[in-house]
Structures are given as C-alpha cells and as structure tokens.
Regions:
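Active-site rim elements
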Residues: 20-21, 75, 95, 251-256, ...
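Short, solvent-exposed loop/turn and secondary-structure capping segments
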Residues: 35, 43-46, 98-102, 127, ...
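Substrate-binding/active-site clefts of carbohydrate-active enzymes
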Residues: 51-54, 73-82, 91-242, 251-276, ...
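Conserved alpha/beta catalytic core and glycan-binding cleft of carbohydrate-active enzymes
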Residues: 54-59, 242, 258, 262-407
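Hydrophobic faces of well-ordered beta-strands that scaffold small-molecule active sites
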Residues: 86-90, 123-125, 171-173, 246, ...
Length: 418
C-alpha cells in the first residue's frame, strides 16, 4: 500500500529496540513489509518466504503465523546414525536442471530414488536460503530464514525433506553466517556500522578470526544479538522444516574463544547442540583444526588433507607411506605429528566438492589419461574414500563418473554424460 496506509508500530516500554503491533486478522494468506522513516521498504529479517521483496505468511485458524500449512507424512523417520552416513552434496539448480532450464525442489524429489539406490542416506544442500537474483550458488546470502524463491515454495521444500525422510535420507543445510550482502534487511534496517549490532568492519578481528568477506558485509559473531538471531534462524529450520543438521561455510572467518564460549562459533553451535544433540553440526573450517572440533559441540569438520593428498597423487607428487597413512587413511590434518581427530565420525572426507573439481578431470587435464582410463583409476580413489576412516561425502554426478564436475555449457546438470 501507500505510505499513508502504513500501520504505526509501538515501542515497547522498558525494552531496548523492541517494536510491536497487534492486529486482528482472519485466517488466510498475507504479505507485509516494514516501512522505515527514511522511506525504505524491507521484508522481515526473519521471513520464511519472500515474494517481490515482501514477506508472505499464512494465518491459520488458530491465529498462528506460518509460511504454509504443510502436513507431514514421515512422522516415524529416525535420523541415520552418524557412523553410517554417506553424504551427497548437491546444488538444487545445477543438479536438477537440464539444458537452459532451472532446477527446483520438485526436480530433486524426482531423483531421490536414484540417490537411494546409490546408497546415499544424507543430502547436503548447497545454500537454499534467499539470495539476490534468480541464479547463484547461494553464498551471497540475503535472508537466511527464507527459502530461495527460485527453487520453490516453503511447502515444496518441506515436501523434499519429507520425501527424503520417507526414504531414510537425512537433509543437511549449508548455511553461510560469515557474511551477508548489503541488501539484507538485517543491514538495511540500520545501515550504520556504529549502530547495527549484527555487523562490524572486516578489519576488526575477533579472537581466532581470519579476515575474509568476499566483498560483502562482515557479521559480528561476538555480539550476543547476533548469536541470538542465528539461533532463532536455526530453530526455524529444525522446528518448521525438520532438517537434520547444518554444514557451516567458511567458519575460519567467524572466530571463537574458549574464554567466551557463549559467543562466536562456539556460542551458536553449542546452543544448537543443546537444543537437539542429535543434529549433525559440521563445519568447513580451512585450514582444518581438529582441536577445535574435539573441544566443542561441533560434530565434524571437512577433512582437507584427505582431498589434498589424493590430488597430490593424481599430479604425481607422491607422499611418503607415512604421510598417506596418517592423512588419508588416518585422521591427521596437514602433518603426521599433530594431534589427529579423536573419532572417525569427526571428519567429513571427500575426493570432490563444490570447491574442488573432479579427480577425473584432474587426471585428464594434468596426467594425460583418457576419460576411460581416468574413470577406471577413479575407482581406486573411491575405494580409499569408502574404506578409510571418516564419513564419506561425494559431489553430484561423481557416482556416475562425470568428468566435468557436473557442469555443462549452461551450468546445469548434464545427465546425458552418464
């Protein structure tokens, strides 16, 4: 509506920065946005669904506000045991789309039988939270509580999770808390670094934080407002969408401090673990840090050395037998003498990921092998992946021996390569 039609919110008495409004609304579907004094219009920073820049909600017969009225079917589902996980990382668009089309949650549902037949019991989704525009890998995150509208509706995402659960497949969400784009309503609602509690200058480093935001805004994880906001978002995904866990991106750039365990990475991972100890809480913390995983509520970290030593082997840079046994077969990171991970379930090991192209491509490009030779040798590396200690993860299309790391000329999955 027009500015003149806007409803004025009230400031809570005795509470800092709390504004509220109470409305008598009948059951139905609604859209709303915030109108700031400077004329800026914003969706809710805790939106579940955003359509054309506005928050969309459903008011139920009991007065509750949700993104939809989805009815769950997989109520008997039990999460796979941690030591049985075989994780499959995929990007909704690239995995499901063909040609010049765009992939959606429904397209992923159509391929769940393929994943189940391949022995997959956990899917790690690259970011599916709201980002600017219609095509992205999702690491330019905008609203981490909202489903990316180009992939489908909240109800369709719930159907994906529900259907996966009926097949015994867990869903792990990739979440990006290190940074946000400047169009995020969490920033736009107070675009002043000195006044907005959720952000800081990227050069103002917190304990154990490395600078790196890829040109986006740096989230301040040592502010209790931030920790509270992150936990509220996590609870949305756990409570309303029934996700089984999270993979947290770029946590080396977040910061942590054992003397301040309620803040930083330790703060919101411990809140999540305390809320539901059965959740998978995994981190991409590179360079990897076994000590951090072993002394926190984090379930597991990406095992960087596993990939690196296999890549060395592909390039003909052969490691010593001790290095291979320590860092590939064993649970060491980067060194044969440091303290390794305590348990195999504390590492996520992989040959390929969204950041690392396929070893088949490496063998063709760097070792001069034919595609058939590379695929045959790739089976040797896959044997190591599935027989060494740790939780194996494969990248979309890897099970079919795709050379290209999945992408065709349109950036989509090329199932014809199968």
């Amino acid at each position: 509506g027009s500015d003149a039609e806007a409803l004025v919110m009230k400031k809570a008495t005795g509470l800092e920065d709390i504004w509220w409004i109470e409305l008598d609304m009948s059951a139905g579907e609604y859209e709303y946005e915030y109108l700031l004094l400077n004329g800026t219009r914003l969706p809710d920073p805790l939106s579940r669904r955003v359509i054309n820049g506005k928050t969309r909600v459903v008011i139920g017969s009991g007065g509750g506000s949700t993104a939809d009225d989805y009815q769950w079917q997989s109520n008997e589902y039990i999460r796979p045991a941690l030591d049985t996980l075989i994780i499959y990382e995929l990007h909704v668009d690239d995995f499901a789309a063909q040609g010049s089309g765009q992939g959606h949650f429904n397209d992923v549902i159509a391929r769940l039988d393929h994943l189940q037949a391949a022995g997959i019991n956990a899917i790690e989704l690259m970011p599916v939270t709201e980002f600017p525009g219609g095509r992205s890998w999702g690491y330019n995150n905008q609203i981490l509580s909202a489903v990316e509208s180009s992939y489908g509706t909240p109800a369709e995402f719930k159907e994906l999770i529900d259907t996966a659960h009926e097949k015994g497949i867990a869903i792990i969400m990739d979440m990006v808390w290190n940074h946000m784009v400047s169009s995020s309503p969490l920033w736009q609602i107070q675009p002043d670094m000195n006044l907005n509690p959720y952000f800081k200058n990227s050069s103002d480093l917190n304990p154990n934080e490395v600078e790196g935001t890829w040109g986006m805004l740096d989230v301040d994880h040592f502010n209790p407002y931030t920790v509270d906001y992150i936990h509220r978002v996590h609870r949305i995904w756990v409570d309303e969408y029934r996700v089984d866990g999270f993979r947290f991106d770029a946590t080396r750039f977040v910061g942590w401090d054992m003397n301040q365990p309620e803040l930083g990475l330790l703060g919101w991972t411990s809140l999540l673990h305390d809320y539901d100890p059965s959740l998978y809480i995994t981190i991409e913390h590179l360079a990897a840090d076994p000590w951090l995983v072993m002394n926190s509520d984090i379930t597991a970290g990406w095992h960087d050395s596993f990939h690196d030593r296999l890549l060395d082997h592909v390039h003909g840079n052969y490691s010593s037998a001790m290095t291979f046994m320590s860092q590939v077969v064993g649970l060491h990171e980067y060194s044969n003498w440091d303290d390794p991970y305590d348990y195999p379930t504390q590492v996520i090991k992989y040959m390929v990921s969204h950041d690392e192209q396929s070893l088949i491509q490496e063998m063709v490009q760097w070792a001069g092998l034919t595609i058939d030779q590379a695929r045959e040798k790739d089976k040797f590396y896959a044997t190591i992946l599935f027989t060494s200690r740790g939780t194996p993860m494969i990248w979309q299309g890897q099970e079919l021996g795709f050379q290209s790391g999945w992408l065709d000329d349109n950036g989509n999955g090329n199932w014809d390569e199968e």
